[in-house]
């Protein structure tokens, strides 16, 4: 998947055996759950809990990859990496990109499925 791809529909469809109904259910569950997950990231950033922040970013990275959200996956990876390095300031700068990529992915999913 090329860098910068917001939504890899072909990839997610292949992983779900080209079942569009299942793809809609999986992506809707992701869209419903991720805003809460991002709020948890925000809480960990505010408290400076880098260990939990790293785990939470890793979780979002994996969920994003499973629904074809390549740009969001990359943004979550950047936050995970910053947290692992102990760089709270860098992790905080990652939050707005992560939120922006989630919004872009949401629009792409809603217009594609």
Where are these regions (language model features)?
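Two-component system phosphorelay core
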Residues: 1-113
